[in-house]
Curated annotation (Swiss-Prot):
SMART domains: VWA (SM00327). Residues 927-942 are cytoplasmic. It is an enzyme of class 3 (hydrolase). The chain crosses the membrane at residues 906-926. Residues 1-32 form the signal peptide. SUPFAM superfamilies: vWA-like (SSF53300). This is Calcium-activated chloride channel regulator 2. PROSITE patterns: VWFA. GO terms for molecular function: chloride channel activity; intracellularly calcium-gated chloride channel activity; ligand-gated monoatomic ion channel activity; metal ion binding; metallopeptidase activity. It comes from Mus musculus. The gene is Clca2. Keywords: Autocatalytic cleavage, Calcium, Cell adhesion, Cell junction, Cell membrane, Chloride, Glycoprotein, Hydrolase, Ion transport, Membrane, Metal-binding, Metalloprotease, Protease, Signal, Transmembrane, Transmembrane helix, Transport, Zinc. The active site is at 165.
């Protein structure tokens, strides 16, 4: 047994204890975004490798963020700005002596620059998957947006757009406009434009020429073809989350300027709170006092980074514990797939093994051909040692030696650490690993290793996986496939399209059909693995009817694998496979299929699975997410199923949803989610997600995913209409003929504090986030998605609905708001749409008395509710909905200024024509005022 320093672990373990108390966002100390002394450090902007080289992009990115820094500083009342920024240049671009990356990569970037896919055009957008006040995934800009100065007319200055998107990303606020509901009727029975603040002015425009207001208003809403153009000169200073393109807009809507009646995402998701209220509640502004003085901060500094050759080292545990539970065999099978299929060509790969000491089995070798891949497979360990000790740090140290062979440094390299042993001395190499510049992905085999080895991944920005000791689990294979290059080039990545594992009785079969869709097919590999004896009888039938048998597969008896690589491009369509267990006892048979994109002209569908946080304490639930996309385009109506495997107990299968309710924030954004609370034991849990869809049910979303910058069609300038160029909508996507399937590991998470044995119910219904209210005559009709008995699963017992004329009362003192009798409302199963109708004036005498003096005056009713389960556990109070009430019957909504609807471009109209038009309109208004019968349909400017 090797001697170890006894003082190092004490210090290291204290560090580990400290790290456990920090939030997941702070655990990645080796890189990442930080706020220090009012300045953001480490903002990472990454350019996709498919973007053609253009140094003007770098120049414009610098100018955009510099402008954004000053704009942000003033908008936040001198609280935050950008101090230093890293720009990750693709490895495909010419090397201009850029600095080398350390742990930075495209898939960790805060901002990405990539070609827009399908019909999104050039809209900048932020991918938001969490709720109000919580961070998003990334900001996306297209090269065209950054290079084409003419787009500034529609979107506004790039720096202002960046701040709009930054508020989405960093502070979790939402758009204050709504393309689906551009108009609404306010509490004064006026038709208003959805905006914030309501002080922003403009005029209604009809596409069919000068027309009376009646032609633009039908049944209290605007006819298609009517639009609203804003005045280019405004007095309103807000809001950045509505229209930062207006020169006067320099701040976020606050408590005094917020338009809580507007039907936008900000009001829905944040319960009518202003964007500034949400932003000031963030940790950024809570811990940042305004900078003294009147001057601006220094401009940001920029560092240009570029990845070099990709360097990977497998660091494999061969201690005695690897003999348990077929761990070594499962490792061999998964590592063979990684080396033969997943790792990309031209990568340098080395292999290290360790028990109580480390050993280099293969120095770095670059992959050019399948022969190079087979040679690396031959270096995989074939037996475990007799040494019971596991010295993870010894293996990691040898791994660093291997990756440093390339250029003397570990910067930008990747270590894939696979271990089954608990090592109390792992803290000895935490700081070394964190400062190495290498990213460490860890796979913990069995429960004893899982709790500590993940720290190496957290500190270096790597992925961590927990692999249960079950041969029926395909988790290790899925983990290896998940570890991609991180470059963002999905056309080079291997995608897992099938993963099936079943225990098959003797002389019985595992048979199924899988799909090779039209976007994949290159470099397609079928891998069959078994548990004991010789290979099963294999029959594989392609869409044209060609049959492949066992003899067509390459058999590795030592690793118990059979692989078949389809030459060229695999035929698109349905493939059928049959595995017959010829062994005399039951055994687990597995089928894995991986493939690459078939063409650069068509983005393949991708699946990214992840959890909100990688550790939680009982009874806090875990939120599981699956980001399903075709390029950058959301895929809707797919069947998305998560499988969660605990250390002990049976797997839990859960369907993820994209309905905008429960754990899901935005409907139809391609991010499917669900609460998970079926905790069997304290410990680690492994996550895998499968996606399948039929072309008859799945569609591609038409709007831009997430929250995006508004493209303004035109403005009113000096009483003239100035239209911008039509927005670029791109091209329509090609419809998939066969549907598709994908599989992805979501890594692992840990749960602490789960009680032993039976315990009382501690899981309430989830918060209702999509409550809507609508006035129908004198009644209010409510609708929402039903929560469950436990979060978003099962069936809740009852609802508590309350209303008030005071927003403060309903939001801050819900228990004392007026109770609505909902005793006859029987809750439905989670996910079902609920409706409930009530009359506010009949709820209580208290409200009747409150309204007695101004019964004919318009007023707003605020409504919220919460659910209760059979254990009397209550959900959080829902989002707040409002509805405008009262006014005499038959009154029609009006537009709030003088009666005029403009059409076309008036820049060629002379001053005389304008004066004549004004006189005609004034004459019409004068005449209409004499006709009371038409007063109710009066149309006005906003």
């Amino acid at each position: 047994m090797t001697h170890r320093d006894s003082t190092g672990p004490v210090i290291g373990l204290k560090l580990v204890t400290l790290l456990f108390t920090l939030s997941p966002e702070l655990l990645f100390l080796g890189a990442g975004l930080k706020l220090k002394e009012n300045g953001y450090d480490g903002l990472l902007v990454a350019i996709n490798p498919r973007v053609p080289e253009d140094l003007k992009l770098i120049t414009n990115i610098k100018e955009m963020i510099t402008e954004a820094s000053f704009y942000l500083f003033n908008a936040t009342k001198r609280r935050v700005f950008f101090r230093n920024v890293q720009i990750l240049v693709p490895a495909t671009w010419t090397d201009h002596n850029y600095s080398r990356v350390r742990q930075e990569s495209y898939d960790k970037a805060n901002v990405i620059v990539a070609e827009q896919s399908e019909e999104h055009g050039d809209d900048p957008y932020t991918l938001q998957h969490r709720g109000c006040g919580q961070e998003g995934r990334y900001i996306h800009f297209t090269p065209s947006f950054l290079l084409n100065d003419e787009l500034a007319a529609g979107y506004g200055a790039r720096g202002r757009v960046f701040v709009h998107e930054w508020a989405h990303l960093r502070w979790g606020v939402f758009d204050e406009y709504n393309n689906d509901k551009p108009f609404y009727v306010n509490g004064r029975n006026e038709i208003q434009v959805t905006r914030c603040s309501s002080d922003i002015t403009g005029v209604f425009v009809c596409e069919k020429g000068l027309c009376p207001h009646e032609d633009c208003i039908i049944s209290k809403i605007f006819r298609e073809g009517c639009t609203f153009l804003y005045n280019s000169t405004q007095n309103a200073t807000g809001s950045i989350m509505f229209m930062p393109s207006l020169p006067s807009v320099v701040e976020f809507c606050n408590e005094s300027t917020h338009n809580q009646e507007a039907p936008n995402l900000q009001n829905q998701v944040c319960s009518l709170r202003s964007t500034w209220d949400v932003i000031t509640a963030s940790s950024d502004l809570n811990h940042s006092l305004p900078v003294h003085g009147v001057g601006l901060p220094a401009p940001p500094t920029f560092s240009l980074l570029q990845a070099g050759d990709r360097v990977v080292c497998l660091v494999i545990d061969v201690s005695r514990k690897m003999a348990e539970g077929d761990r070594l065999l499962r490792l061999q099978q998964a590592a063979e797939l990684y080396l033969m299929q997943v790792v990309e060509a031209h990568t340098f790969v080395g292999i290290v093994t360790f028990d109580s000491k480390g050993e280099i089995r293969a120095s770095l070798q670059q992959i050019y051909s399948d022969d190079d891949r087979k040679l690396l497979v031959s270096y995989l360990p074939t037996a475990v040692s007799t040494d019971a000790e596991t010295n993870i740090c010894a293996g990691v140290k040898k791994g660093f030696e291997v990756v440093e062979e390339r250029n003397g440094r570990a910067d930008g390299s990747v270590l894939i650490l696979v271990t089954s042993g608990a090592d109390e001395h792992i803290a000895n190499c935490l700081l070394t690993s964190m400062n190495s510049g290498s990213t460490i992905h860890s796979m913990a085999l069995g429960s004893s290793a899982a709790r500590k080895v993940g720290e190496l991944s957290r500190l270096t920005g790597g992925l961590k996986f927990f692999i249960p000791d079950k041969f029926t689990s395909n988790g290790m294979t899925e983990a290896f496939v998940r570890i991609s290059s991180g470059t963002g080039d999905i056309f080079q990545q291997s995608l897992q399209v099938e993963s099936v594992c079943e225990t098959v009785q003797p002389q019985h079969q595992l048979a199924d059909t899988m799909t090779v869709d039209s976007a994949v097919g290159n470099d397609t590999l079928f891998l069959v693995t078994w548990q004991t004896g010789g290979p099963p009888e294999i029959a594989l039938l392609d869409p044209s009817g060609r049959k492949y048998n066992t003899g067509d597969f390459i058999i590795n008896l030592a690793f118990r694998t059979a692989s078949l690589k389809i030459p060229g491009t695999a035929k698109h369509g349905h493939w059928t496979y049959t595995l017959n267990n010829t062994h005399h006892s039951p055994q687990a048979l597995k089928v894995t299929v991986a493939s690459r994109a078939s063409s650069l002209a068509m983005s393949p569908a991708t699946l990214e699975a992840f959890v909100e946080r990688d550790s939680t304490y009982f009874p806090q639930p875990v939120i599981i997410y699956a980001n399903v996309r075709k390029g950058l385009h959301p895929i809707l109506n797919a069947t998305v199923v998560a499988t969660v495997e605990p250390e002990a107990g049976d797997p839990v299968v859960l369907q993820l949803l994209d309905g905008g309710a429960g754990a899901d924030v935005i409907r139809n954004d391609g991010i499917y989610s669900r609460y998970f609370s079926s905790f069997a034991v304290s410990g680690s849990y492994s996550l895998t997600v499968h996606v399948r869809h039929s072309p008859s049910t799945s569609t591609l979303a038409l709007p831009v995913p997430g929250n995006h910058a508004m493209y303004v069609p035109g403005y009113i300038t000096n009483d003239n209409i100035q239209m911008n160029a039509p927005k670029n909508l791109g091209h329509r996507p090609v419809k998939e003929r066969w549907g598709f399937s994908r599989v992805s590991s979501g890594g692992s998470f840990s749960v602490l504090g789960v009680p032993d044995g039976p315990h009382p119910d501690m899981f309430p219904p989830c918060k209702i986030t999509d409550l809507e209210a609508m006035k129908v005559e004198d009644d209010v009709v409510l609708s929402w998605t039903a929560p469950g008995e436990d979060f978003d699963q099962g069936q809740t017992t009852s609802y508590e609905i309350r209303m008030s004329r005071s927003l403060w009362n309903i939001r801050d003192d819900f228990d004392n708001a007026i109770l609505v009798n909902s005793s006859e409302l029987v809750p439905q199963h989670a996910g079902t749409r609920e409706t409930f109708t009530f009359s506010p004036k009949l709820v209580t005498h208290e409200l009747d008395h409150e309204l007695a003096e101004d019964a004919q005056e318009p007023y707003i009713v605020y409504v919220a509710l919460r659910a209760m389960d059979r254990s009397s556990l209550r959900s959080a109070v829902s989002n707040i909905a409002l509805v405008s009430m009262s006014l005499p019957p038959n009154s029609s909504p009006v537009v709030s200024r003088d009666d005029l609807i403009l059409k076309g471009v008036l820049t060629t109209v002379g001053l005389i024509a304008i004066l004549c038009l004004i006189m005609v309109v004034a004459h019409c208004i004068f005449n209409r005022k004499k006709r009371p019968s038409r007063k109710e349909n009066e149309t006005k400017f906003l």
